Amino acid sequence: MRFSHFLKYNAVPEWQNHYMDYSELKNLIYTLQTDELQVGDNEEGFGAGKSSNITDRFKNKFSFKNAKEDTSSGMNKDAGIVEETIELRELPTAQTVAAKPSPFRRMKEKIFYKRRSSSASSVSSTANENLQLDTYDTFVGDLTAEKQKVDDFYKRTEAKFYDKFDALVKDLKKIGVIEYDIDDDTLFNEPIASTNDEVPPLDLDDDEDDDEFYDDQSNIEDNTALLHHSQYNIKSQKKSLLKKSIVNLYIDLCQLKSFIELNRIGFAKITKKSDKVLHLNTRTELIESEQFFKDTYAFQAETIELLNSKISQLVTFYARITDRPHNISHSKQELKSYLHDHIVWERSNTWKDMLGLLSQADELTPKETEYNANKLVGKLDLEYYRWPLPRPINLKFTSINNVALPKLFFTKKAYKIYFIILVTGLLLGIKTFNDAAQHRCMALVECVAFLWASEAIPLHITAFLVPLLVVLFKVLKTSDGAIMSAASASSEILAAMWSSTIMILLAGFTLGEVLAQYNIAKVLASWLLAFAGCKPRNVLLMAMCVVFFLSMWISNVAAPVLTYSLLSPLLDAMDADSPFAQALVLGVALAANIGGMSSPISSPQNIISMSYLKPYGIGWGQFFAVALPSGILAMLLVWILLFTTFKMNKTKLEKFKPIKTKFTVKQYYIITVTVATILLWCVESQIEGAFGSSGQIAIIPIVLFFGTGLLSTQDLNAFPWSIVILAMGGIALGKAVSSSGLLSTIAKALQKKIENDGVFAILCIFGILMLVVGTFVSHTVSAIIIIPLVQEVGDKLGNPKAAPILVFGCALLSSCGMGLASSGFPNVTAISKVDRKGDRYLSVMTFLTRGVPASILAFLCVITLGYGIMASVVKGNATSA
């Protein structure tokens, strides 16, 4: 197995970015080899000097560089060399090299001398020597940077785990597992073998209990499911909690030990690779001699001994708390079993992803086969309510003894469906409009809207139902007003569902997937978070900025998931009741909702809205001009709301470290295609003669990423197709209400009611409606239902800018409903976040107390700042489409 794969299999998933970057160092080696090969055959004779005493070079490398930097720029080169030589001889390690300059120093001085005085015939040789030194310096420099990264992370993590260890020891002392008067060092430093002596088990439950019930139940069988009184008293509960703490800390420390071992193996492997490819001798001189690890903490023998000691102590604690202090080996084996189960569970998806086994189920264990069989039986069986008959009914071939009705007919969802069918039937039977098609279309809209609002069936299944109902209800009309035949209506509605909007939606998913999969979004986001510093409110603001920025390009569906993964080092260290943790989780969700208005591809509702804005000449440029200022202001106000309502100032944080990596050719290719696609979308109105629509531009990144193999069929299958289908259902519903004339009729009726009101007042009215529907139903559904209506209302008003302003404003406001845990994808993601104990960070009340005010703040930003900018950038009435 390749070591890069071995590293991924065995690495702790949450620590992936803190291991040595083996693949990057390997790429560096091959790059340096290519540079050497380009020099030609002029390197002959240099090999012996190159491999001589690399240890001296490593010792003097960094002090040489420092001396070089300290040299005044006004000095001549000879003076600089003298100063460097003096400083090198004054180093603490000079006792081993002062008598005779190292080969590295002699070589450097020789090269500097030749730079001044060599003839033209020796220039090539000097360049070759310079290249070899640069090769060594570059490789060891990068190797040292990786070592420092590993060491820094280990020290931080060890300190955190050892604090937990100390707290655990105190708790164990309180319940008597460890005696106060015993010297900890004496107890802890005993070898495990010495603990095999018989020690009486601890009696934590020595209180007498005179309860006659338990006296009577003294002969209860061992296999009873009832809890004994000793199993739910306070001491027993403490004992169970501490046992769990020991297991968790044992797993943490073992993973920390594997972190050291994996990185040490990695450094040995990569130096072996460099020696083989670049003809160096780094493994022997640096790794095997331990010279490379002398300035680290993680790789010292004392560090490993201390870690092993802590692990051994945990085994002893576990043996004592389980009343088996004489059986250390069994306790050790049991803890190893917990470790194994944890690793298998935590990394199963990682392993399956790498082995390509996620979609394969042909190698099942007997237990898995039995489980699947039972699951199939559960699917096939139907549960019934049964009522016995007074007397059996005897038929020719059977007899009926009772009446049975399936339970699924009496569920909450079933009652919702009954209600919707009843109301739809009433609307079909009662005349609501003079026009028959509009009358039936009203019943259709009510049926679909209620199904979406109640979620009696899944949203995307309702979307599938729309084209069928459109044909059955006969609501589509021809250009002369006649009702379409079923065949014509079917072709018309199905053709309308696949539109430019759907292509842009797929392109948005493609860009989001490729940016996330190739680590580009994560790297950029980590650098943004690194600027936040250590103040909780600054970290909160930067986290909100990151998810807002990511939402612009990879949608506000994927952005919060990626941001939470970046924040996991912070969240993992905090409990669910931490105010800062709650503010962080909620802030990301609210910022992602607001980020849903930030760009034309940041959310499904924006993509749908753009199809209504295009006829008014509103493209990407105008969208950004309105959405970005409104969104940024709303995000800042929500940030102020959060840090004033959550008491987070007492939280102490470590500075977030950015992910330092060099982008590869593939990553630059992805960035180039992404930026080019966005630019084409921005200037789409100017190049409409070439592409025709934004949907055609959307094909470009799809082809360039899937066609080149950067994304696979599995990635395409993983797209959130339910959202795509929901958008298609919305398009079909919009086509139906438009073709039937229902929207026009409603718009005329509303026009008479509000024709004397200004555009601003109308925007406020419909904006409140958008907030309510978006909060209680769905952001996307609110856009699907209301935006076509406001477009018709706006077109009927006298102001030529009314329609684009109303559509634009409602499109932005559709993202502002965030008062409930179910209001939008970001909120659903946030409410599902739990800490390491399995407790939720947020509650429904948290969303109500912060989400509702946040919705109002965002609403005010759109109808004030957003309205002012919209009034200046929109052009007026729709152009001919």
Curated annotation (Swiss-Prot):
Instruction: Look up keyword Ribonucleoprotein and say if it applies.
Output: no
Annotated keywords: Membrane, Phosphate transport, Transmembrane, Transmembrane helix, Transport
Q: How does it sit in the membrane?
A: Multi-pass membrane protein
What processes does the entry annotate via GO biological process terms? phosphate ion transport; polyphosphate metabolic process; regulation of phosphate transmembrane transport; transmembrane transport
Indicate the transmembrane segments per the record: 417-437, 456-476, 493-513, 514-534, 539-559, 581-601, 663-683, 691-711, 718-738, 758-778, 805-825, 854-874
The places in or outside the cell where this protein is found are: Membrane
SPX domain boundaries: 1-288
Give the CDD domains listed for this entry: SLC13_permease, SPX_PHO87_PHO90_like
Pfam families under this entry?
CitMHS, SPX
* Disulfide topology: none
On the tree of life, the source organism's domain of life is: Eukaryota
Predominantly, its location class is: membrane
Relate the induction remark in this record. Answer: Expression is constitutive and independent of inorganic phosphate concentration and PHO4 activity.
Entry keyword annotation includes Acetylation: no
Gene Ontology cellular-component terms for this entry are:
cell periphery; plasma membrane
Q: Any other comment in the entry?
A: Present with 3430 molecules/cell in log phase SD medium.
Q: What does this protein do?
A: Low-affinity phosphate transporter involved in the control of cellular phosphate levels.
The entry's family comment says:
Belongs to the CitM (TC 2.A.11) transporter family.
Name of the molecule in the record: Low-affinity phosphate transporter PHO90
Record the organism: Saccharomyces cerevisiae (strain ATCC 204508 / S288c) (Baker's yeast)
